[in-house]
Amino acid sequence: MKIKSLYALLFCIFTTGCLDGQKQSDHAILIAYTSTEFPELGSSVCYLNERGDTVIPFGKYHYGGSDTIRHIGFVVEPHTPGWTTINNKGEKLFYTFSFDNGPDYVEEGLFRIINDEMLMGFADTLGNVVIQPQFAFVFPFKDGKAEVTYTGAKKAMDDYGEHWTWQS
């Protein structure tokens, strides 16, 4: 595992050195290292840049499935309303809506985000907030449109409460 990680780090160093004069800080790549042999959801994680410098230390976030971060990545923070989305500098951007046991899927280049008040909006895959959180619930984009509502409530679809829908 350590050899594979070393190869991945060397690959990043060589590929980021060939950016045709573009600023490397704009294209920083972070690689995840976990406290477990294999990355496991929720395990302690740190992120190193292509030079091997620690950008995000162990303990700040837990592993959320992003083993490489070019623009944005998803990590887990205890007691937050979803997946935390960070940039390649380790800065928190926003929370991502949880869907199907993970961060929301990208539909038409956008995914759903939530704020501390549990209002929803949309962001793109570069970490730009495209539509500020302002809705009680939003459905993913389809054919250039998304259904949104300012009112309503979650309703369980089964006896276990694992699956739910939104009624407004």
Predicted regions and their residues:
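Residue-level detector of conserved, function-critical positions
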Residues: 22-168
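Bacterial Sec-dependent N-terminal signal peptides
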Residues: 1-25
